[in-house]
Amino acid sequence: MPNSHWTPADIPDLKGRTALITGANSGIGYRTAQVLAEHGARILLTGRRPDALADAARRLRADVPGAHLETVELDLGDLAAIRDAAAPLAAGETLDLLINNAGVMDVPERRLTRDGLELTVGTNHLGHFALTAHLMPSLQRSSAARVVTVSAVAAAWRAGDLADLMSERSYRPMSAYAKSKRANVVFTQELARRFAGSAHRAVVVHPGSAVTNLQRHTSASRTGRLFVALASRTLMGSPDGAAWPSLFAATHPEVTNGAYLGPAGRDQTSGTPEPVRLPAGADGPDLGAWLWRESERLTGVTFPVPQT
């Protein structure tokens, strides 16, 4: 996968391709949508708040005149809303790129989604699990669909152990975040196994570190405040560079099914995307099968891609 000099300028013409990006109102998601639109892709811009979504659409049309763009209201913390948002697309749309980008982090107290799931894992993993399942008919209409899920360096933290997935025994904000990001990796590895033998690809990325709206809860957590304060001085880049792994995963012709991509720079904080080491045990088929079953149980969604 030669990529030492890759930049978004190397992205091929995407006319005729449709991409849905979650959390595209701002930050990494917005930049991802902008670059894909610049290369001709039709963009399905999703977000939870109608006002922020409309504002993002206005900005994108100004940034990319002539962009082929539609908006989809989507709350990843509401399973019924996910189903309803996906239904019209699943009924007849062809989806070539699904970029599972949205997320929350460092929620100071244990909160629940509308469906009674712990908010961080419920949004970052289970919401995207359900969305991907509901959109599978659209993805399968593509000749070579890609599902790109955005994880984080936190996936490798010891606190990311998936035992007590819903943090029912104890809750710590950054532990819940690490669990959700490890679940993103494990989910992608299992989806890649189920895509084996097809032209479809499941890819997981981490963006390094970037200052974005993802940190909006950190003011309430001392640990979160310290993490963001230190990282913003030393490690964090802009959403522009942080979008590169997602863009590379979505468009580079040599990206392989099951790849894990991150920045090539110092401590994987920034730089050109490259394959990086998976968190220990994250590609185990037993863990993948368990998380899949548990995710189906918690969401009530049956994923239409059978285990191989």
What are these regions (language model features)?
Residues 160-165, 217-222, 263-274:
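Short, flexible, mixed-charge acidic loops at enzyme active sites
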